[in-house]
A protein has these predicted regions:
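Hydrophobic/aromatic residues within well-ordered alpha-helical segments
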Residues: 75, 82, 86, 90, ...
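C-terminal alpha-helix
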Residues: 221-231
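Amphipathic alpha-helical packing segments from all-alpha helical-bundle domains
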Residues: 130-143, 147-177
């Protein structure tokens, strides 16, 4: 009986060890997959998709090219997963994607919004755009690829134009309702408010040392906008 108990015990230990090994292998595979996507985004944001090879990605990760294909079947699949990850992060964290200025729950603490409040809120989002690695690299990748890839061009239009205009239009309509701003063409007002900020963000991409200068420009620009359209 003792022998049988020992045998059963050994079998149980063996099963547990195999399960642990399998779990470790799965985690390692997931970690490698995530690292491939991270490295691919790094390379795509600098060199572009076309100029980046599978070999370059594998070398940067520290694996063989053949090993990379056990995680992704092609460079296109890597790109698809990179874009999906960037878009998920954007949808989850960007105020431009998530904010609804017609939602009373969102606006209930913004009834007394001042020009300074708006400037601070916008400056905070600009810093996030500049310093969140996924957002920053994703933007740069889209800028490079928008002329080669229709899907990415459409995504670029959405995240760097449509969502931004929609956000600022919503904010302006809200401020008009609160009698903070006078009524005018809200789409044009949104473009007037957001377009210089977009230009300054692009300037920071090229010349990071000018960030504080840009922050001051954003602050003065928002205050002047409120001054011009004040009711």
């Amino acid at each position: 009986m003792l022998t049988n108990d020992r045998t059963v015990g050994k079998i149980r230990v063996s099963v547990i060890e195999k399960a642990v090994a399998a779990g470790r292998s799965t985690m390692e595979k997931i970690n490698t997959r995530d690292e491939i996507l991270k490295v691919a985004l790094d390379l795509f944001s600098v060199n572009g998709y076309e100029a980046t090879s599978i070999s370059q990605i594998a070398d940067a990760v520290g694996i063989r090219k053949a090993s990379l294909y056990s995680h992704f079947s092609s460079k296109q699949e890597i790109l698809d997963n990179v874009v999906a990850a960037v878009l998920t992060g954007y949808d989850n964290h960007s105020i431009f994607a998530n904010t609804n200025w017609d939602d009373p729950e969102f606006t209930k603490d913004k009834q007394g919004m001042t020009a300074e409040d708006a400037a601070g809120m916008i400056q905070s989002q600009v810093r996030r755009i500049l310093h969140d690695p996924a957002i920053s690299k994703g933007r740069k990748m889209l800028m490079i690829e928008q002329f080669r890839n229709k899907e990415l061009a459409d995504l670029q239009t959405r995240v760097n134009y449509e969502d931004i205009i929609r956000y600022f239009e919503g904010m302006i309509r809200f401020l008009v309702r609160m009698n903070k701003l006078k009524e005018s063409d809200t789409e044009i007002m949104a473009a007037q408010l957001s377009s210089p900020i977009t230009v300054w963000i692009n300037l920071c991409d090229r010349e990071p040392s000018r960030e504080e200068e840009v922050m001051e420009l954003v602050h003065k620009h928002v205050l002047q906008f409120f001054e011009i359209y004040a009711k």
